[in-house]
Amino acid sequence: MERSLAITALGALAQTTRLETFRTLVRHEPKGVPAGELARMLDVPQNTMSAHLATLSRAGLVTSERQSRSIIYRADLDGLRELTLFLLKDCCGGSTELCAPLIAELTPCCASEVEKS
């Protein structure tokens, strides 16, 4: 990930509603959430939510897909992965024992899904 895109992504997440929107979308993967439902869930006017979703989309953190009359939004997990890797690149000066606790914290969220595959 380029530094400028990382700055854009971090800037997009540096706002309360956008951060909560992104976290909500991550929790609802892979199904996604319609825009109107997101607005209701977070008690935000629909036009405001639309602007926040556009910002997250431009930052490479959210994707959308039209399904019938709704637009379904999803967290872009590839974008999240790239941002996380950008932040952790060259972690701990190459001392794997220092990074091990961090890796262990990140692994449990998806371990059961990986085991099912």
Task: Show where each model-derived region lies.
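Short, hydrophobic-biased segments on the C-terminal half of alpha helices
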Residues: 53-54
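Amphipathic alpha-helical dimerization/coiled-coil segments
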Residues: 1-5, 26-27, 77, 81-117
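N-terminal helix-turn-helix DNA-binding core of bacterial DNA-binding proteins
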Residues: 4-45, 71-79
